[in-house]
């Protein structure tokens, strides 16, 4: 019995010296350090964040540098995130172009609304067309890369259609007549195509630096904007006193 009592004391002493198992569980877990690329986004924000990242990549690196992986890196998210939201690069470019067309249309409408005379509204809208392209050359390039876009996407279809409606209104103002976008006469269609060809062609030549030679032959100080103004005025009657 004495031996048993001694053994019991040893067992009790060992038990008192052991740390409870739950004490280990209470130790704080070591957290992984967040890298700069692990930017957290709320569920509803990631789509917009990816589009903004795509805009930055486009303006900085051009269309050639705009890839799904580049956008993911810029946004600080996984490489799979852009694919999940847009499907492929065509999907991303299409959503980006939709944003461009909306901004483009807003700029033309704002410029036109600042004028009172119909002809001046048309001239102001045309100048806003060129100014937008100069301010956002990368976005403008995407908007008119039809082969890279999916016009079956509602956002792009609606935005581009609204921009065309704005162009139609500008031509209608210069002609001082009502034009139905759904039903055009041949003469009206020709007027729209002529105006669009002039402004878009001028814009592309300007962005590519192809107008430098012409501008160098004009009186010193003549700007591209003045050249555009002279071109536009040949297409519309000049209001009295202007």
Regions picked out by a protein language model, each given a short descriptive name:
Residues 173, 195-214, 231-241:
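Amphipathic C-terminal alpha-helical segment
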């Amino acid at each position: 019995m004495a031996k048993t009592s001694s053994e019991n004391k040893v067992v009790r002493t060992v038990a008192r010296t052991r740390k409870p198992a739950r004490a280990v569980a209470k130790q704080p877990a070591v957290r992984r350090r967040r890298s700069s690329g692990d930017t957290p986004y709320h569920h509803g924000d990631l789509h917009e964040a990816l589009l903004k990242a795509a805009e930055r990549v486009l303006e900085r690196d051009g269309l050639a540098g705009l890839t799904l992986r580049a956008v993911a890196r810029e946004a600080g998210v996984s490489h799979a995130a852009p694919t999940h939201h847009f499907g492929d690069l065509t999907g991303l470019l299409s959503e980006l172009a939709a944003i461009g067309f909306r901004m483009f249309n807003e700029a033309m409408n704002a410029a036109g609304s600042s004028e009172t005379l119909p002809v001046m509204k048309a001239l102001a809208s045309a100048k806003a067309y060129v100014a937008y392209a100069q301010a956002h050359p990368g976005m403008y390039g995407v908007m008119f890369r039809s082969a890279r876009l999916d016009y079956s996407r509602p956002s792009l279809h609606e935005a581009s259609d609204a921009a065309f409606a704005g162009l139609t209104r500008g031509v209608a103002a210069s002609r001082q007549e009502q034009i139905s976008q759904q039903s055009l006469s041949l003469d009206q269609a020709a007027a729209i195509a002529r105006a669009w060809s002039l402004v878009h062609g001028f814009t592309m030549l300007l962005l590519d630096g192809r107008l430098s030679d012409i501008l160098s032959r004009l009186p010193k100080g003549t700007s591209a904007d003045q050249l555009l103004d002279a071109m536009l005025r040949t297409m519309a009657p000049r209001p009295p006193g202007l």
